[in-house]
Amino acid sequence: MEQFRNIGIIGRLGSVQVLETVRRLKRFLLDRHLHVILEETIAEVLPGHGLQTSSRKMLGEVCDMVIVVGGDGSLLGAARALARHNVPVLGINRGSLGFLTDIRPDELEVKCAEVLDGHYLVENRFLLQAEVRRHGEAIGQGDALNDVVLHPGKSTRMIEFEIYIDGQFVCSQKADGLIVATPTGSTAYALSAGGPIMHPKLDAIVIVPMYPHTLSGRPIVVDGNSELKIVVSKDMTIYPQVSCDGQNHFTCAPGDTITVSKKPQKLRLIHPLDHNYYEVCRTKLGWGSKLGGGGD
């Protein structure tokens, strides 16, 4: 296992609890004589920290590992910036859900010590890359760890579009939108729209229509290396939007083409050795526990 010496810290702004956890984490890492680098936005709200700082974009070039303190949204943003550097990412949960940031604040020192001592698991999570083209020219690009979503924006009208997979026409749809999700994103917006849960190790993409105006519109799971094209109808009078992880947004025009495919670089997500995906689902999604309260 890799030995981590240069540790970056990213923290969600606007939370007293996050700042408290970042301070604890900083003290813990310094006590282990590690080199700590703060992402510049969190460094600004920690006066007198005395540490090296870096932009998020450059953090992956100077760190062996990056620890994100916040919720899943914080880790999504970090993942898009860090995946291209192949730097491992560890999450400490200070959000409401914690599918990706799975270390609780009360176990920070114990779990981080295990990871730093070489006792951890690594999952490679792939991202999607999306490109919006108008008259053959790219007008917007974005990456997503969870999902790429076509939606009406501020309009309440349905969107008409065609779907192509690997150059083959699949169908036309009239719906509130379309969600294209990774296995990581299958437990996010896609799940709320009726999509299936996909194990993170699957090399697959799920396409989930949002309230389609048909009884036969259903999610479809395709190979993870597929290239998906969504063509917005030229007859549309509204300008829908494309959102990547709900954080980056692009406005489309009638006739635009949205291309979605797997990004070459992957996120290296670190978990403690006792991480159990099904336990996470059971806890976060309210699945039933063992019958009778026991048994192996």
Swiss-Prot record:
Keyword list, A-Z: ATP-binding, Cytoplasm, Kinase, NAD, NADP, Nucleotide-binding, Transferase
EC number: 2.7.1.23
Active site: D72 (proton acceptor)
Catalytic activity: NAD(+) + ATP = ADP + NADP(+) + H(+)
Annotated signal peptide: none
Main location: cytoplasm
GO molecular function list: ATP binding; metal ion binding; NAD binding; NAD+ kinase activity
InterPro entries xrefs: ATP-NAD_kinase_N (IPR017438), ATP-NAD_kinase_PpnK-typ_C (IPR017437), NAD/diacylglycerol_kinase_sf (IPR016064), NADK (IPR002504)
Keyword NADP appears in the UniProt entry: yes
Annotated residues for binding of NAD(+): D72, G73, N146, D147, R157, K174, D176, T187, A188, Y189, A190, L191, S192, Q247
Location of this chain's protein in the cell: Cytoplasm
Root EC class: transferase
UniProt cross-references to Pfam families, sorted A to Z: NAD_kinase (PF01513), NAD_kinase_C (PF20143)
UniProt cross-references to SUPFAM superfamilies, sorted A to Z: NAD kinase/diacylglycerol kinase-like (SSF111331)
UniProt KW Protease keyword: no
Annotated GO CC locations: cytoplasm
Cofactor(s) essential for the protein: a divalent metal cation
Superkingdom, taxonomy of origin: Bacteria
NCBIfam families in the cross-refs: PRK01231.1 (NF002306)
Role description: Involved in the regulation of the intracellular balance of NAD and NADP, and is a key enzyme in the biosynthesis of NADP. Catalyzes specifically the phosphorylation on 2'-hydroxyl of the adenosine moiety of NAD to yield NADP.
Family listed: Belongs to the NAD kinase family.
Descriptive protein name: NAD kinase
High-level lineage: Bacteria, Pseudomonadati, Pseudomonadota, Gammaproteobacteria, Pseudomonadales
Gene (name only): nadK
